């Protein structure tokens, strides 16, 4: 039962004190005082356990009896004051008529999980407060009637914020709510217990090796199969291997997308901020992929048991199933060659790298055909798988890019752009031929003109230096040929035949130029 008292100073806010009933201590304590009015006048009917009565008076309360509350009697534990009342309460407090005001009930909180206290009265005489096993002592004021009949009341928690926080922290519903939240959205516990559970859990991390549960009895029970059945089992096994590859591919795609999302989130929030959000999802999805992959591998193991095949420890720990499949095919081919007698003699020295190593490197090259440049970690992984050194792997990729990868790229380019390239080459050849023919024609015409000019200049007996420079100067020196130079060097003089030829030619030209009607023949 809770009673609200106002401060004598005239405070307007109402304060709440939680009063819990305790029947055992009620019978032990007795006090005597006079009362003008009882609580039965205020509350109609029987007073029940844990019933709260709110009594905010409109005026100051006059206390007629000596009701003292010592500082040692009141205890404060966890920000709350708890009092206990008996079932039948007859108040010793003289009060005036009360009116009930329920104005600020939502802001007033009751405090639980506190040390039990007692408040008892008998025969309606006295009212005392006791509290046991308290950690802190609440200083209180004394209720007395020193002529003024004033009521002193001490209040420790009068701020709504601090009262709300303390009430939430000391609430009895706090632990159950925390447990429920931990079951639903517990991130830290999952991170802490994840490593312990992952060791014993079947769904481990995706890249950890899975246990292959194939017993020797299953292998021994493999019977002779017909070629058709064996072929069918081989096809099923190849399909299952492709399914394993697809699962690996999808998981890697999911992992890369999650890493990209986490990196973009960490760019804004800071390094490592995305780990609490992504780690749980990664572990859970990894378990799903792991279970799916294990189921497929169990089917593969069953088929291998029927075929009588065995896996080595290297194949069990291998992370590239396609390379494992290629290795198995090479072993089968080698066994077939041994049966047919096509094995290379042992005395013949082996040139180059082993076929098994080359097949693994070639498989990696074709898987990364668009960018066949392995990283350092990939070189180390390939060197472990092939049994070669890191330098041998690097040299093989250098030679393979030059001898194998580049010609294939060129062939692909020719297949895609072959027709257009041929048309361009044909057009270029035609233009070159036309340029050569035009150049030859021009050279012939220039050589003939130079010869004619040389002959005309030799027939003139007396010429000045300027005229000789004009005659023997090459109008187009850039296009002078060796034929013109030889014709000039082989000239031996001026003869009579040349003179007669020149005279006849000059007469003909004079006759043509003398007739004005023949000028239109030379107009271009």
Swiss-Prot record:
Residues 195-205, 216-235, 430-445 have a biased composition (Basic and acidic residues). Residues 229-300 are annotated as: BELL domain. Signal peptide: none annotated. Residues 171-187 are annotated as: SR/KY domain. Residues 195-236, 429-463 are annotated as: Disordered. It is found in: Nucleus. Pfam families: Homeobox_KN (PF05920), POX (PF07526). One of its GO terms (molecular function) is DNA-binding transcription factor activity. Residues 346-408 bind DNA. Keywords: DNA-binding, Homeobox, Nucleus, Transcription, Transcription regulation. Residues 446-459 have a biased composition (Low complexity). GO terms for biological process: regulation of timing of transition from vegetative to reproductive phase. One of its GO terms (cellular component) is nucleus. Its main location: nucleus. May form heterodimeric complex with the TALE/KNOX protein STM. Interacts with OFP1, OFP2, OFP3, OFP4, OFP5 and OFP15. Belongs to the TALE/BELL homeobox family. Transcription factor that is responsive of the nuclear import of SHOOT MERISTEMLESS (STM). The SR/KY and BELL domains are responsive for the interaction between the TALE/BELL proteins and the TALE/KNOX proteins. This is BEL1-like homeodomain protein 3. The lineage of its organism: Eukaryota, Viridiplantae, Streptophyta, Embryophyta, Tracheophyta. The gene is BLH3.
């Amino acid at each position: 039962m809770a009673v609200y008292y106002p401060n004598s100073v005239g405070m307007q806010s109402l304060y709440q004190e939680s009063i819990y009933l305790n029947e055992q201590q009620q019978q032990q304590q007795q006090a005597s005082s006079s009362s003008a009015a009882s609580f039965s006048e205020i509350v109609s009917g029987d007073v029940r356990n844990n019933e709260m009565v709110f009594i905010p008076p409109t005026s100051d309360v006059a206390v007629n009896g000596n009701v003292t509350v010592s500082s040692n009697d009141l205890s404060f534990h966890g920000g709350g004051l708890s009092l206990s009342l008996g079932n039948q309460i007859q108040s010793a407090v003289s009060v005036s008529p009360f009116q009930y005001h329920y104005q600020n009930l939502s802001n007033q909180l009751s405090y639980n999980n506190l040390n039990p206290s007692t408040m008892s009265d008998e025969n309606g005489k006295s009212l005392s407060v006791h509290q046991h096993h308290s950690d802190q002592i609440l200083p209180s004021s004394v209720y007395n009637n020193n002529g003024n009949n004033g009521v002193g009341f001490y209040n420790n928690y009068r701020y709504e914020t601090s009262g709300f926080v303390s009430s939430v922290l000391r609430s009895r519903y706090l632990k159950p709510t925390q447990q429920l939240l931990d079951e639903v959205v517990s991130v830290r516990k999952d991170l802490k217990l994840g490593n312990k559970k992952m060791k014993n859990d079947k769904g481990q991390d995706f890249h950890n090796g899975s246990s292959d549960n194939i017993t020797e009895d299953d292998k021994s029970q493999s019977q002779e199969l017909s070629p058709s059945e064996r072929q069918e089992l081989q096809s099923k096994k190849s399909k299952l291997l492709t399914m394993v590859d697809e699962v690996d591919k999808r998981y890697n795609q999911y992992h890369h997308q999650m890493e990209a999302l986490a990196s973009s989130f960490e760019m804004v929030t800071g390094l490592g901020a995305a780990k609490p959000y992504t780690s749980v999802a990664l572990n859970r999805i990894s378990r799903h992929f792991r279970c799916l992959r294990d189921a497929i591998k169990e089917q593969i193991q069953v088929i291998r048991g029927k075929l009588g095949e065995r896996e080595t420890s290297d194949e069990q720990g291998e992370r590239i199933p396609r390379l494992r499949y290629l290795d198995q095919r090479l072993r089968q081919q080698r066994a077939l060659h041994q049966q047919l007698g096509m094995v290379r003699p042992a005395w013949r020295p082996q040139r180059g790298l082993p076929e098994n190593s080359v097949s693994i490197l070639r498989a990696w090259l074709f898987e990364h055909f668009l960018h066949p440049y392995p990283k350092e970690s990939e070189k180390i992984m390939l060197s472990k798988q092939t049994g070669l050194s890191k330098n041998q792997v690097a040299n093989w990729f250098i030679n393979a890019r030059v001898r194998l990868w580049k010609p294939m790229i060129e062939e692909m380019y020719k297949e895609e752009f072959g027709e257009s390239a041929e048309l361009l080459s044909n057009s270029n050849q035609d233009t070159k031929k036309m340029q050569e023919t035009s150049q030859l024609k021009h050279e012939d015409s220039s050589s003939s003109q130079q010869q004619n000019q040389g002959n005309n200049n030799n027939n003139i007996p007396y010429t000045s230096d300027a005229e000789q420079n004009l005659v023997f100067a090459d109008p187009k020196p850039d296009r002078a040929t060796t034929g013109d130079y030889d014709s000039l060097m082989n000239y031996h003089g001026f003869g009579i035949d040349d003179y007669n030829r020149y005279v006849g030619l000059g007469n003909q030209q004079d006759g043509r130029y003398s007739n004005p009607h023949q000028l239109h023949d030379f107009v271009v």
